[in-house]
Structure formats: C-alpha cells, structure tokens
Amino acid sequence: MNTPDEALQADYTRDFLIALYSHKAVTGFIMWGFWESAHWKPAAAMFRSDWSEKPNLQVWKDLVLGAWKTRLDGVSSAQGELDVRGHHGRYRVTASVNGKTVSREFDLAPGGGRVVLQLP
C-alpha cells in the first residue's frame, strides 16, 4: 500500500494476506519491490532504504512464517501411525527408531492424504 502511514500499511497487509489466504484458488504469495530504494512506489516497500524493517514486513513474517507455518513434534502410536493436521504445502518428515533416522519430503494437498515413511 503506497502510503507513508506505516500503521495503515501493516493493517492493510494483514487484512489483504488473510483475504488471499482464505481463498481456495490462492497457492502462494509473491512480494514484488520489497526495498524502498528500488521500489516503483517507495512508500509501499517492506524495507526502508537503510534496510530496517517496516511494520508491514513484521505482519508478513507473523503470518507466513508464524501462524501459517506448521511445526509438529510427535510420537507415533504402537502401530507406527501419527495423525496430524497441517496447512497445504511442502513438508519434511523425519522419524527415528532404534537409533536410525529417515527423512522424506512430501506435499500436503487440499483434501489431505496419507504419507508412508518406511523405517529400517
């Protein structure tokens, strides 16, 4: 948002990202022109010219790297199963048994699914 009012920018960024994230057709965010000294609308940037962070960047971090980022530690059942919920996206699962560790990446798509990790 191209305004010198940084609090308004932060509020707008929060509301806009939440609206986008809530829509089923949105699969990601791309931020163009994040640095004030190279932005076509300098007041809209997330970093000032001296690279200090503006409040709208903190909002972005709080949502994208905080509230919307799934982090989970757990212990599987006796059958070796662990049921979890997560946001759509790419994950890395790491499991250890008897001193051996296995990692695997997978994508969690809408509708969920089952991921099987074979342990030695």
Report the location of each language-model feature.
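Aromatic-rich peripheral "rim/lid" segments of glycoside hydrolase catalytic domains that contact
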Residues: 1-120
